[in-house]
Amino acid sequence: MSMIKLLKNTLKDPKKIMRALEFAPSFVFGKIYLSIFGINPLKVHNFGKIHIRKYDSSTIIIKSGILLRDVEIAARGNGKIIIGENFHCEPYVRLNVFEEGILEIGDNCGIGSFSIINATKKITIGSNVLISSHVHIIDGDHGFKKGELIRNQKMVSEPIEIGDDVWIGTGVKILKGVKIGEGAVIGAGSVVTRDIPPYSVAVGVPARVIKKRE
């Protein structure tokens, strides 16, 4: 059934109208919201609320086959967000870029609930990457030189690169300047502060390689 026929049939039945209105805040308004920000709503399957904040000269590019649930996507300054095909995002995920920051996510990636990605410099995530829930990927932190309030100091940022086919476990924190090689696995609760070689399994605080994938 075409969208036009569906709408006509719905408008003829008051009960159908009431049911449609119940879902309007999450589904219909989500489609309208995407359209306002220049994103083709037909490319996105949305469930729940979608918050997109696009400021100044920022750019948000979303490819096809995307599944979003209660997600917040925000691009500030001249920031850029590029999301590849078949991206699945669980509820309460936040994707943020600041200033000149860039966030690039490859194809066939998934992010679990309550995860946060903040890019001030550049965060690159390859294809076929699995990111579990409550993961934080942040490419910057505050300067903390003595003699000046930390809150007044500039951010110190370094790019993060995550290769293809990486699995990041629940509650992992990935900090600035880190490169995680293709096929690596990061165990739950780890804090990644240094590079992880390809096809390595790393765990702990800070994360250390304990073995290679076989």
From Swiss-Prot:
SUPFAM superfamilies xref list: Trimeric LpxA-like enzymes
Gene3D superfamilies: Hexapeptide repeat proteins
PROSITE patterns, per the entry: HEXAPEP_TRANSFERASES
Keyword field contains Repeat: yes
Class of enzymatic activity (EC top level): transferase
Family matches, as Pfam families: Hexapep (PF00132)
Keyword entries, A-Z: Acyltransferase, Repeat, Transferase
Cited CDD domains: LbH_MAT_like
Name of the molecule in the record: Uncharacterized acetyltransferase MJ1064
